[in-house]
Amino acid sequence: MTETMTKTMTKQVHWNGNVQEEAMTILQAGKGMIVSPTKVGYIIMTTDKAGLERKFSAKNRKRNKPGVVLCGSMAELEELAEMTPEIRDLYQKHWDQDILLGCILPWKKTGMAQLPDDGCQELMMDQRQTSCFVIKFGRPSEQIAKELWEKNHQFAFASSANPSGQGNRGLVTGIGERIEEAADLVIEADDYVASIQPDKNIDTRYEQGVMVSMVDQDGQLIPEQNNQVGIQPCPIVIRKGLDIDKIMANMALIFTSFDYRHGFYY
């Protein structure tokens, strides 16, 4: 094979059912970028600014959206994000029910202080200094995020592993050549992803999780409702996705008022 024909191949492994040590080695070393399976498909996972820069380059994506922070435990979530007791109760309910949930929240100052001092803040928050804090996103990636935080206090930042604006259809082959070539490691688990929505096909399955905004237009945390009707601003479901029916039912148990505005990002 001539040198011009040689192509660097990203290492691909099948999920081993536990913490994928190859992923830990790459991410702990810094500047790494991997592709990992979740309940709804595949994500790009990084831990620092260098990794985030690689992600934006691989996805060819605009930088105005709040970053996604993967929380491997409720303790990590509570340490990082500002929440009212009602919001915390919502997370706890979904944690206990093993339901994927992401909410737009402000950072605690003490949480922000733990970010790497490398300028990553500008790439994983929006201009309001909010991020989407996600729990119960699927065992293959949960295990990595939990271990990163508990062993090294490293963050797990995420973005869907597909060309921006396109879905990966829950298949590792759907992540696209650009992302595949850019990643240091691809963890394949098409069987796991398919098992989460066994009654769906490629055309009817959800390719994303539900996202709920818990902040006002300036990024300030919404007020508690305390069973009062009509408190504004209120939670807004801004993206439908996996288990939307269960999540809205749970929200109705905690909040007397919330809005459903799919696509109402900014």
Q: Locations of the language-model features?
A:
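Active-site-adjacent structural elements in enzyme catalytic cores
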Residues: 2-266
